[in-house]
Amino acid sequence: SIFVLPDLPYAKDALPKISAKTFDFGK
């Protein structure tokens, strides 16, 4: 699973547009 933690609290609505921290668990 891929988990993306955006730097901005509202960024979840704009994930394709922001630079997010991405964590890959279990590939």
Swiss-Prot record:
Its EC number is 1.15.1.1. The keyword Manganese applies. It catalyses: 2 superoxide + 2 H(+) = H2O2 + O2. Its cofactor is Mn(2+). Keywords: Manganese, Metal-binding, Oxidoreductase. It comes from the Bacteria. One of its GO terms (molecular function) is metal ion binding. The keyword Cell inner membrane does not apply. Binds 1 Mn(2+) ion per subunit. Homodimer. Destroys superoxide anion radicals which are normally produced within the cells and which are toxic to biological systems. Belongs to the iron/manganese superoxide dismutase family. This is Superoxide dismutase [Mn]. It comes from Desulfovibrio desulfuricans. The gene is sodA.
